[in-house]
Amino acid sequence: MKHSHEEIRKIIPEMRRVQQIHFIGIGGAGMSGIAEILLNEGYQISGSDIADGVVTQRLAQAGAKIYIGHAEEHIEGASVVVVSSAIKDDNPELVTSKQKRIPVIQRAQMLAEIMRFRHGIAVAGTHGKTTTTAMISMIYTQAKLDPTFVNGGLVKSAGKNAHLGASRYLIAEADESDASFLHLQPMVSVVTNMEPDHMDTYEGDFEKMKATYVKFLHNLPFYGLAVMCADDPVLMELVPKVGRQVITYGFSEQADYRIEDYEQTGFQGHYTVICPNNERINVLLNVPGKHNALNATAALAVAKEEGIANEAILEALADFQGAGRRFDQLGEFIRPNGKVRLVDDYGHHPTEVGVTIKAAREGWGDKRIVMIFQPHRYSRTRDLFDDFVQVLSQVDALIMLDVYAAGEAPIVGADSKSLCRSIRNLGKVDPILVSDTSQLGDVLDQIIQDGDLILAQGAGSVSKISRGLAESWKN
């Protein structure tokens, strides 16, 4: 569904002078979703990225002008430039935009404009926000409310990470990594949990991070709703400071929407939610782990508070196939030593890695877990080094790839070799460092056994590597 420029004036009247919007770093998950929404609203979209891929190709097919690589001439004709937080200050397109006095804004500022004239539901938190955003989006879709959604990962049921709906509802993932979620002014805000991460943004001060989240929740109008996880002690510490209505969810006895009797059979979860009015709702999930039960209950709480019928909620949750790269099963493969299953997962923080391992253990019984782990950013590896050592020691076999730098300079003692050394010293697993990923398949064939679950874990290029491995194993 595309709109004419006359129709755009009715959708976002204040943006009527904007004709062309240029995205620097358009291939990123958050950037591409916003670009797709604006493209479907009828704006001319251009964008650049350092590499071509599925996302940039899809945008090009939809009508966006895509450039591979960055050059000053790419911003020609742009009314406004949207910049990813990954873009450096010396980027030629960014430099030229400022010289030409073209407005340059963060992606969250553009998302805020899209949200301004809609009923916004924003999902924040250190872990689980992509999955929770996807679940809420699918519930509203199942309820025939045709929401607009912008997610940080693929919504598998929809086959994309963004959709322009016809209704007033907008469901969006809120990014705390650069504190840009403070631009958003939603009607409902979900916070899944809070742990120290992206601490460079918060000057290494967790108290500053907490205060920023409270400020985010105070962007709600006085009649808005905050939905917070009762199992997270940091969030419960913040509740008295939130001057808005707060609804909680979780396994905790104090939760307004309380999870009881959780059981996992294979990779399927089922449990009961006790609602504030003591209504009991039986939930079936086809994604594993208690962390996904929490994500689903956050989505259920939002939907119930906004008056959506149980039938739509339960059907959407039962049909939910997961978000892209969240326990993404790539298939079963016959290898020289037997049959193995390969799973790709985005988790790159020790807590995320831990819950993925736990869900795999519960679903995979007494089978071995072989992990291919790619640390993401030197700064995160440094800040959470001891936590990584502990959690990565929980698997049966560990292959370590080099750190995915994400533009950072190396930090002494925060590389994969150092991580391997400390894990080996702990004595629970003997990691294998594989710097040349072309050797990964051969290394795996030497260590895997019949029935193994192979977890490819991390936020960098490990997904592409694991999918390449799956393709080669099919042949």
UniProtKB/Swiss-Prot annotation:
Pathway: Cell wall biogenesis; peptidoglycan biosynthesis
GO terms under biological process: cell division; cell wall organization; peptidoglycan biosynthetic process; regulation of cell shape
Statement: the UniProt record of this protein carries the keyword Cell cycle: yes
Catalysed reactions, as listed in the record: UDP-N-acetyl-alpha-D-muramate + L-alanine + ATP = UDP-N-acetyl-alpha-D-muramoyl-L-alanine + ADP + phosphate + H(+)
Enzyme Commission number: 6.3.2.8
Compartments reported by the entry: Cytoplasm
UniProt: ATP binding residues: G125, T126, H127, G128, K129, T130, T131
Coiled-coil zones: none
Domain of life (superkingdom): Bacteria
NCBIfam families: murC (TIGR01082)
Alphabetized HAMAP family for the sequence: MurC
Chain's role: Cell wall formation.
Entry's family note: Belongs to the MurCDEF family.
This protein's name: UDP-N-acetylmuramate--L-alanine ligase
Native species: Haemophilus influenzae (strain ATCC 51907 / DSM 11121 / KW20 / Rd)
Organismal lineage: Bacteria, Pseudomonadati, Pseudomonadota, Gammaproteobacteria, Pasteurellales
